[in-house]
């Protein structure tokens, strides 16, 4: 077949990179010059009738598409503003989601071409500054336009399902759609990711899981608030009193971003955590909420894990069993922390699990004695490290106190050794090998980290 063809309906095209390409008659939105028309033909078999009809449909509705696409892009930008803000440097407050304008939005992206897929689906493809590899696209040919990635448009796989409605594959692992969720005083969009290949589609366990989620999603938000409350109050006992009194709890620092449903029907949210500008996996499909790393949620059915009645899920990691927990050290900022139980090639012992369970029952009663231990250590060894560090005035022996001395610590993990010894491990500028706060019989002792690990 020739590399140049002329069609009465479509015009004259040149074949390039698996598609027929030509310039259209006019610019569209913020395209640089006349908009490019790209018609997919990977195997160079010629333009299909369904693609010609798709182009006619586009021309008949072009003005409507141009008028609505900006609204869809603005909504998408607002729902994904954290991703943009974290990916692009040198931006100012005019790009915040509450004040973003159409003019500002189009400084972040450029319309490249109208793309017509082999099945007649079509949409606008954009380059964007926050994802240069995958870009962004608006699929226009559906009953309601859908914002997807440019790579999804160019390798489009669609599935119309009675439970999920229109699903679009991400060309990696998931079928995707969107759901809306009332979150405090706003409505947020949660991307739904249903595990499955292009060939396999989705299964009944996943449909059942999604129906269950839709039925209980408001309840899941309430459960999440109750789960987080002990961390914020610093006491499980206080949290239980609060909840027993019927008071409603909401935590805005943890915002659902994605709903992941695996092949077995396990499901949970991937939540944005404001305190560390990161993400956390939250399993929702069981009676109790469990938090974990994002990849542990995504691979939940495949992960090597165990569930303890008191401690919850533990995941196998090399010579350890690990768990993700949340803590507010000294009633400061919330931290996402890791429990590490050293077992080598065995399962945790009853003693190790008992120590972990007992630790959770102390309701942060350790924090005050930890301050005393740290101050005692600091004053005792001050002469050993004062020449090696730049000591601020407030941390000199004259001014240091039990409240500010702990500011030099960075906690890294809660460690449980083979023998059942348990301690918070932390980094300190005063000790190259780190410090540890060991808990024994309800008491705290500060030791050098190598003594326990």
Annotated model-derived regions:
Residues 1-19, 25, 94-189, 248-334, ...:
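Acidic, proline/glycine-rich low-complexity IDRs
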